[in-house]
Amino acid sequence: MAMGNPELRTHFFRSSHEPGIPNSLRFPNGFLVTCGLPWLLLLFSVTIILFHPLRKKSDLPLINPGKGRIGILRGYRSRKTFTTELPRLVADGLSKASAFRIAAPDGVNIVLAPSYAHEIAEHPDLNPGPIAGDEFNSHINGFEVFAQLGTSDVISESVRTRLTRQLTKLTPLLTSETPLLLQSQWKDAPDWVEVSPHETALFILSRLSSLVFVGDDLGRNPDWIRILTSYNTEAFAAAEELNLWPQILRPLIARLKPSCRQLRRYIRDARALLVPVLEQRRHAQSQGDRREYNDAIEWLDETSRSTGQPYDPILSQMLLAIGSFHTSSDLLGQVLLDLCMRPDWKVLVRELRKEIISSLQGEGWDKIALNNLKLMDSVLKESQRLKPASTVTMGRYASREITLSDGTIIPKGSTVFIANVAMRDSNIYPDPDDFVPDRFTTRREKGDSSAYLVSASPEHLGFGLGRHACPGRFFAANELKIVLSHMLMKYDIKLPDNGAVAPSKSGIFLATNPDARICVRRRKEEIVI
């Protein structure tokens, strides 16, 4: 369950009322919809033109100021370039300064070079909580799942402590479920079949994570899986569309857009499925049932009671799904493509199979076996290095004005990111654009403690850095190794004739291309795993 870099926080039953239209703007007999809406949009637009141009908040250079004299048009063009051209903007910015500004949908953000990563990660006045809320408009109904970020520590503490402590107990569940899920997707055909690595990864990992998060009954419910995977995918797209509008108009636009209305339905449907499970467990406990549940429903509740912090069980589960489904499936899908794109892919897959067989010859799937998958660990980390989840990372909100060690000033209220470029730095990684499967295995042999998949360092920010690094990365690493082992032992893989497909880019996100395909063929595995 790779949580990406957003640290999972939550709040109990946060009010999710839609922002209402002030009484002064209400019209009788449906006038607002039929006649008043165009004038209301015009009024808001004029307000923005007059009072909301892109303003300087610091002396740092602004890379995408936009063109034109009208503030609203200039702001739209800046937001558009952020969405479509962020990698180029970051490269342009770093060629001019180690600290610069970029106009984004949620305002003008500060981007810093990787050399600032440690300082930003440990600064007490830089908090990741508000970032996702702004980016995903968490104050708007339908996006309130993201409001769980930054309001309490219930989710992050549940993942960091309770989930991590249960890794050994969860391994049998993952290893027994994975072959069933994989067979349902790739079948047993002896001939080559074309499949989507993205869809396969999402299908398997969403179901494995759901079993861990909500238990056996609801975790196997196809409606629950559909709701969470659909919300996971569509919330990002809806937020991107909404962010092209000025902030002042977004609550109104969200009321009208079908995609935003659909998000609200997903939340209602998820609540309708999970609430009966919660009530059933509470009723059973009140009747003396002492059954112990090893899932996130219980971990969240235990953490809330031990810390005294409230949370919303439904929104918390949806946020866990976003953190788990999205980043883990993206990495697994990309690894499959990277393996197939290697000129010597047959040799590499053969070496990985040898390592799997050797690792499982002892006690089977245990902690030692997972730790012995060193080449696989390196392959996963190398794939994440070449195609991280985002162009910028470690988003932080400045709660007061901050002066960094080199004199750079971060104004109060600023959003700060680290440019995710160190992983392509030739001074750190020789041949940085090449996929080198054993790159991190070699580093581990030389005593580099940062060369493990789960290690976070300024040179590899795949899981963030410092106290806000992804708390679920240890579970994610185990889950990915188990699933990839079953894939490689049970199937041959290769690229189709039309070859590789580049990752897709949108805003800060870099994703495995959903149109990419690989070919798979059932093989006879050397050992039963």
From Swiss-Prot:
Comment field (misc): In A.calidoustus, the austinoid gene cluster lies on a contiguous DNA region, while clusters from E.nidulans and P.brasilianum are split in their respective genomes. Genetic rearrangements provoked variability among the clusters and E.nidulans produces the least number of austionoid derivatives with the end products austinol and dehydroaustinol, while P.brasilianum can produce until acetoxydehydroaustin, and A.calidoustus produces the highest number of identified derivatives.
CC per GO annotation: membrane
Primary location: membrane
Protein name: Cytochrome P450 monooxygenase ausG
PANTHER family (UniProt xref): CYTOCHROME P450, CYTOCHROME P450 MONOOXYGENASE AUSG-RELATED
Organism listed in the record: Emericella nidulans (strain FGSC A4 / ATCC 38163 / CBS 112.46 / NRRL 194 / M139)
PROSITE patterns assigned: CYTOCHROME_P450 (PS00086)
Binding, heme: C470
GO biological process, one term: dehydroaustinol biosynthetic process
Required cofactor(s): heme
Subcellular location: Membrane
Domain of life: Eukaryota
